Design a protein with these regions (language model features):
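Phosphate/anion-contacting hairpin/loop surfaces
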Residues: 2-190
Length: 190
């Protein structure tokens, strides 16, 4: 409760959304997108969070007051997808007000991210949602991949919303567990 500092980052090497206790130093001349965010949601109240499954797209719903004094809903869409990360401001009709990174036809033939067009979610990758599947479902999907690849890469292609670092950690834990079991069996036989 109370006011909190919200950090939104679309940097390719560290995209994230989180509350922070310290206030980062602001640049002397804020970027245009920052000024637009301040204008549209400054003083607004965060009233909802939405996410499609476990996909790495988070929608922050703000109740704000516009220039005319009317209460309006504005969504700030945070697409946390590595080098394709973006932050998009969307009005209550689902129309893009603006985005940190504009995407036109020269950059993508699949999806435009430009002012005054309807916002569309990134194309589904048809991965497994960990909240709706079992460990057996994941194992089966990994086993059914048609190529041989390291476990961390197979997990990344199979599970929705996980980052490469999480997949590497899962692979490490699986290998550590397998090594401990093998060592235990060998010790028991000695």
């Amino acid at each position: 409760s109370g006011n909190k500092k919200l950090l939104l980052s679309a940097r390719a090497n560290s995209p994230r959304v989180n509350f922070c206790s310290s206030t980062p130093e602001n640049p002397a001349q804020p970027p245009m997108f920052c000024m637009l965010l301040r204008k549209r949601i400054g003083g607004g109240k965060l009233v909802g969070l939405r996410q499609n499954g476990c996909d790495r797209v988070l929608m922050l719903d703000f109740e704000c007051v516009n220039e005319l004094g009317d209460t309006v809903m504005i969504a700030v869409v945070c697409e946390i997808m590595g080098m394709y990360s973006n932050i998009i401001i969307v009005d209550s009709n689902g129309v893009i007000i603006d985005s940190l990174k504009r995407v036109d036809l020269t950059m993508s033939s699949k999806r435009l991210v430009l002012p005054n067009i309807k916002y569309e979610l990134p194309e589904s990758q048809n991965k497994l949602n960990l909240l709706e599947c079992t460990a057996l479902d994941v194992c089966t999907a990994v086993k059914n991949l048609d190529t041989e690849m390291p476990l961390n890469k197979a997990l990344l292609r199979t599970i929705e919303g996980v980052s490469p670092i999480v997949c590497r950690e899962i692979e490490y834990k699986v290998m550590e567990g397998a090594t401990n079991k093998i060592e235990g069996v060998l010790f028991d036989r000695l």
